[in-house]
Amino acid sequence: MIKFIMLFIISFLPPAIYAIWIRNTEKYEREPWQAIFIAFLWGATIAIIASLILEILLSIPIYSSFKDYSVASFVIAVIIAPFVEELTKPLALSLRGVKKEINEVEDGLVYGAIASLGFSATENLFYAMGFLSYGLLLFFILVAILSLIHI
């Protein structure tokens, strides 16, 4: 249980720090913390679940179309997964608690980035489960750097 708590903190801390930084970059009308939390939570939970379901459904015909398992896995990892993930993350902008707060152009950018960071945090946790043998320091460095690619 202690390992999971450590992995959770290491996985979520860099994206949370980036989210705070992005929220605070607005000069005039900063977004409310509640809406920021909703967008982050969307990315960390619902977008992940929706992505997993869609990726599984779309991978079935891909695996049956290719005789080579490695080619099918490559197509899913390089084409299907990014497309599905980038489709589910911005849906946070349509949430009631977020949508009412969008009144400037950059608001959409802020909430989109925050939802992406939430997605990144959960994805980091998934990867962390497999990285235990490599050491927590290496994993923390990867999380700190790779969280930004989701924005």
Residue ranges with predicted function:
Residues 1-149:
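Hydrophobic alpha-helical segments at protein termini of multi-pass membrane proteins
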